[in-house]
A protein has these predicted regions:
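Active-site groove signature of glycoside hydrolases
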Residues: 1-13, 156-165
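Substrate-binding cleft of secreted/luminal carbohydrate-active enzymes
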Residues: 132-177, 193-200
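Surface-exposed flexible segments
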Residues: 13-35, 170-189
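Aromatic-lined glycan-binding groove of carbohydrate-active enzymes
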Residues: 15-134
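Carbohydrate-binding surfaces of carbohydrate-active enzymes
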Residues: 182-202
Length: 202
């Protein structure tokens, strides 16, 4: 067994190899298992090969919004219009957030979103996934689970991004509109795949 160490911005660490090696030494010196380093990736996986990380979590949200393209134009338009312009229907976003080839590969883990709207923080420059529902969330889960189904058991990992501190409209918790809808759908999908142990826990 290893300790999971997730790095949100590997490129923000100038000496990544030294950083990883240092933490492995600290783990060994303190009688801990080695770390398993996973780096968050939003662009090409090919650019990451050869670095010190063990695996990658692939986040394709930017691809769904085409954020890498026309960035300057988008920023300029956000100042001109009194409303967010970077809006995509969740039903379309869930297709763009999935890579049928890469998500099947070993040591590449999907990152998926139940919803996204950080307009309370970003205002008119916000990115918004509009029209998310528990049913569409279930469709995304089912698709991604099917892609990792044939991986080795220890490699069947999905990261669900639900961090409403930074993206206020990015959450799984019960709300007034859908109640426990998102959690119930996820529970249903996981039980369907028999990912719970005999005690009913993850």
């Amino acid at each position: 067994d290893k300790l999971l160490f997730f790095i949100y911005d590997p490129h923000g660490i100038p000496q990544l190899t030294e950083f990883v090696n240092r933490w492995q030494v600290l783990a060994q010196d303190n009688g801990l298992p080695p770390f398993y380093f996973i780096g968050n990736v939003t662009r090409s996986i090919e650019q990451e090969k050869g670095n010190a990380l063990d695996a990658y979590a692939l986040d394709l949200k930017n691809k769904a919004f085409n954020i890498e393209k026309n960035t300057v134009l988008r920023k300029g338009l956000s100042y001109l219009f009194p409303f967010p312009i970077n809006v995509i229907r969740y039903s379309k976003a869930i297709d763009k957030m999935v890579d049928d080839i890469l998500f099947r590969k070993s040591k590449i883990y999907p990152i998926i979103y139940p919803n996204w709207d950080h307009s309370p923080r970003a205002g008119n420059s916000a990115s918004i996934m509009h029209g998310s529902t528990p049913q569409l969330w279930g469709k995304l889960l089912e698709k991604v689970i099917s892609l990792i189904h044939d991986k080795d058991e220890g490699d069947q990992i999905i990261f669900i991004k639900s961090w409403n501190e930074w993206g206020e409209g990015n959450y799984l918790e019960p709300d007034l509109k859908y109640g426990r809808g998102y959690l119930d759908v996820m529970n249903k999908m996981l039980r369907k795949e028999n990912v719970y142990n005999e005690r009913g826990k993850w």
